[in-house]
Design a protein with these regions (language model features):
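Amphipathic alpha-helical assembly segments used for oligomerization, scaffolding, or translocation
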Residues: 1-330, 351, 385-389, 444-445
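C-terminal structured domains
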Residues: 298, 302-446
């Protein structure tokens, strides 16, 4: 099939640019993973080294021209990093919630011990009372408080015989422990709402959101009448769940903004620099309202820059390949192609024949067809036209080989057979005011 063709071109230049953009976003994703883990207190140096090793392996793929593998694996790696970071945040939240529950249990136990000591008429030292009432010291003060509840030693005035008898009587008796004492106390029911609050508060902390206003309200619930506690707790839980949802979304948006800023870092245009500055200010100010618009703007700019790069690279690759095959390619033809939508190249060895290139302006599809130069008034040698169209078939295959050898590729989307349509005739008359680079040739259909 060597008649008019519609084809796609992928160049090594385009593939390298796309892969480098992927790697920049991967670097930003690794930095985001590190930041999240450090903030949550779950940083793992060994895992961080593994992340870096995988990143280095992916970069080696670029050096080895393994473009397809890299473009598949980098998005998967970024997805894994995000998922892993979220899992670690959730684990940190669970651990923090458990710590909150433990502190709450310790505070309850300390209050119970103080009440028991007071009821037993024990003299509680001021420092012990202070330690039992302070959350950070309550747990370690409990053993000392419990010791005051334990049976007192025998009176020092007792005789040796009395002490010996008491020792024999208690020899096989198990001494009560704090756990035994707690087991004998009325059970304190931990509300499900308290556990959920702890989890939400912990996740807010892990997300970098200040949980103190919610924590203060949660603490104040204990002072409310029991008839109102459930209603207030439900209301607080709704607000906490909403805050966590917003925190996750904001964290994801800012992470995406940082990745986009990293991808824009190689673009030194005025527009890209200004956009990077705006992204930086939005992230620093935690301006979630402008994040969505900035993300859309950054993606549009990146896509447009890549489209222009890819389009220019495709035109250059095709023109350079045709020059290698003996077609006359002049400086400025790429520009003429962009401006005019098509360009005609003459075959140096057979100047009465050539090819016409078009497309690539509004889509990534290019068109090519063999053409003949001459006059509409002159008779055509149809047999020779068919022969030259067949020659172009083999030359197009060589063009595919050349582009492939440079790391790119050409894929034919649609092609007609030799002779399926008459050879397009280009009126070979150049106007005096035209240059060699841009020929405004009158096109006639024979």
């Amino acid at each position: 099939m060597s008649g008019p063709k519609v084809f796609h071109v992928v160049t090594r230049e385009e593939l390298v640019a796309r892969c480098e953009a992927h790697l920049r976003r991967l670097d930003a994703a690794i930095a985001e993973w590190t930041k999240t883990c450090k903030r949550s207190g779950v940083m793992d140096a060994e895992v961080a080294e593994q992340n870096a090793a995988r990143r280095d392996a992916l970069r080696r793929m670029l050096n080895e021209d393994r473009f397809t593998e890299l473009q598949k694996q980098v998005p998967a790696e970024i997805s894994f990093l995000r998922s892993d970071a979220q899992t670690r945040v959730e684990r940190a939240a669970v651990a923090a919630a458990q710590a909150m529950q433990n502190r709450r249990r310790a505070a309850r136990t300390a209050r119970m011990l103080l009440e028991a000591l007071t009821k037993a008429g024990r003299d509680v030292p001021a420092d012990l009372k202070r330690d039992l009432e302070a959350p950070e010291t309550a747990e370690r003060a409990m053993a000392r408080a419990f010791a005051l509840l334990s049976p007192v030693d025998l009176n020092s005035a007792a005789t040796d015989r009395q002490r010996k008898l008491a020792s024999e009587l208690g020899r096989d008796e198990k001494r009560a422990t704090l756990a035994d004492w707690l087991a004998g106390q009325p059970a304190s029911v931990e509300r499900e709402s308290e556990l959920r609050m702890d989890r939400h508060l912990a996740e807010l902390t892990a997300l970098g959101v200040d949980p103190s206003p919610f924590a203060a309200r949660a603490a104040a619930l204990m002072g409310e009448p029991s008839s109102r506690q459930a209603l207030l707790a439900d209301s607080l839980l709704v607000e906490l769940a909403h805050a966590v949802k917003e925190g996750r979304e904001k964290s994801a948006r800012f992470a995406e903004l940082r990745e986009l800023a990293a991808e824009l870092a190689h673009d030194d245009s005025t527009g890209a620099r200004a956009l990077r500055d705006r992204i930086g200010m939005a992230v620093a100010a935690e301006d979630g309202l402008s994040a969505a618009a900035l993300i859309a703007e950054a993606n549009a700019l990146i896509q447009e820059k890549m489209r222009v790069l890819a389009t220019d690279a495709r035109r250059r690759a095709v023109l350079q390949g045709l020059a290698t095959l003996g077609y006359e390619v002049n400086e400025g033809m790429a520009t003429a192609w962009v401006q005019g939508g098509q360009v005609v190249l003459r075959k140096a060895a057979n100047p009465e024949y050539g090819v016409e290139l078009g497309g690539g302006t509004k889509s990534d599809r290019l068109q090519v067809r063999a053409v003949a130069f001459g006059s509409a008034q002159s008779p055509r040698n149809t047999s020779r036209d068919l022969d030259m169209e067949a020659v172009w078939c083999s030359e197009f295959q060589r063009l595919q080989t050349l582009v492939s050898a440079s790391g790119g590729g050409i894929e034919i989307e649609h092609a007609l057979a030799v002779g399926a349509t008459p050879l397009k005739l280009i009126e070979d008359a150049t106007r005096p005011d035209e240059t060699d680079e841009v020929r405004n040739l009158k096109t006639l259909q024979r």
